[in-house]
């Protein structure tokens, strides 16, 4: 018969051990809370970025993503080209997720071996010359050209279809950015309204109207016209969705084109370096749902 343990005679009665276990539990709890707090702080800094400074945000389907003005400018180029080509939303999502994984949406002039640009395409693999690949318009179209040659790409999981195009050493990583791709495509394609905002410093240059016209016609394939005084630019869109696509595209490119405000219908985004720029508000004047008006920075008289 095994020896019986009287109360207080077993290992649990050892006060030293009890204290050690208690300290261990306390350490684990404190460590866990610290880890959670650290993670939450990093997420708050990454996603909220409310410490000031320039930032752009897009929100759709309950998710919000934050990027620098440069990154959001490139995202707008990608989605805009996809729309201009008449491609489905899935194509934009795939392209955005791929560019986030490959370059973090930056048009970088370096990479693994001879990889370059938004999609880290390689001249040695026939993607084009270095100069061509470093042109976001060219590199995005090259990506879409390869994508549409894949039968059934719209129904494929993103890891498979992106790998077919990119031949990456880490194909599973593309899936990490699918939610970001969906949010940016939904916003920039106009499916989600009043959901693209940018907090920006005051413009340091004036709007080059010819560049703005070329940007819209080349990417979104829409046209507009400046006012006589050069202080605004108007686009009459064929539908409300296209109007929101154009409007939020212009917000995403406000830094590039020195745009100080965008109005779509009865809502408006106004450029500023504070929290007011992180939301759309009521416009000063009523507008038709399909009219987009961008306020420009004119040249000095």
Model-derived regions: residue spans:
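N-terminal export signals and maturation junctions of secreted/periplasmic proteins
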Residues: 2-80, 193-194
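Non-catalytic terminal regions of proteins
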Residues: 3, 206-301
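Peptidoglycan-targeting cell-wall enzymes and recognition modules
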Residues: 55-66, 104-157, 164-169
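Extracytoplasmic/secreted envelope proteins and their assembly/folding machinery
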Residues: 72-79, 92-95, 118, 137-144, ...
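Short, functionally critical alpha-helical segments immediately adjacent to catalytic or ligand/cofactor-binding
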Residues: 79, 89-104, 165-166
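N-terminal carbohydrate-binding/catalytic regions of secreted carbohydrate-active enzymes
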Residues: 82-84, 109
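Catalytic and binding regions of secreted/periplasmic enzymes and modules that target cell-wall glycans
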Residues: 140-208, 227-234, 263-269, 292-301
């Amino acid at each position: 018969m095994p020896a019986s343990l009287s109360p207080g005679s077993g290992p649990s009665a050892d006060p030293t051990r009890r204290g050690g276990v208690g300290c261990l539990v306390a350490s684990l709890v404190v460590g866990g809370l610290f880890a959670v707090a650290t993670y939450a702080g990093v997420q708050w800094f990454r996603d909220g970025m409310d410490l000031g400074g320039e930032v752009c945000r897009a929100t759709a389907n309950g998710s919000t993503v934050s990027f620098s003005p440069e990154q959001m400018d490139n995202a707008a180029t990608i989605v805009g080209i996809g729309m201009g080509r008449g491609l489905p939303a899935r194509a934009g999502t795939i392209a955005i997720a791929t560019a986030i994984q490959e370059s973090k949406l930056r048009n970088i002039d370096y990479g693994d071996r001879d990889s370059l640009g938004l999609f880290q395409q390689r001249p040695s693999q026939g993607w084009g010359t270095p100069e061509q690949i470093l042109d976001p318009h060219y590199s995005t179209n090259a990506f879409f050209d390869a994508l549409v040659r894949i039968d059934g790409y719209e129904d494929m999981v993103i890891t498979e279809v992106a790998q077919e195009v990119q031949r990456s050493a880490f194909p599973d990583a593309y899936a990490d950015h699918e939610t970001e791709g969906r949010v940016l495509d939904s916003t920039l394609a106009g499916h989600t309204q009043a959901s693209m905002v940018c907090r920006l410093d005051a413009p340091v240059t004036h709007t080059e109207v010819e560049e703005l016209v070329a940007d819209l016609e080349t990417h979104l394939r829409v046209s507009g016209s400046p006012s006589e005084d050069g202080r605004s630019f108007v686009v009459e869109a064929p539908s409300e969705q296209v109007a929101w696509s154009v409007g939020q595209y212009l917000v995403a490119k406000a830094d590039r084109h020195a745009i100080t405000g965008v109005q779509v219908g009865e809502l408006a985004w106004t450029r500023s370096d504070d929290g007011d720029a992180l939301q759309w508000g009521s416009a000063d004047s009523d507008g038709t749902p399909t009219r987009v008006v961008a306020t420009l920075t004119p040249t000095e008289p």
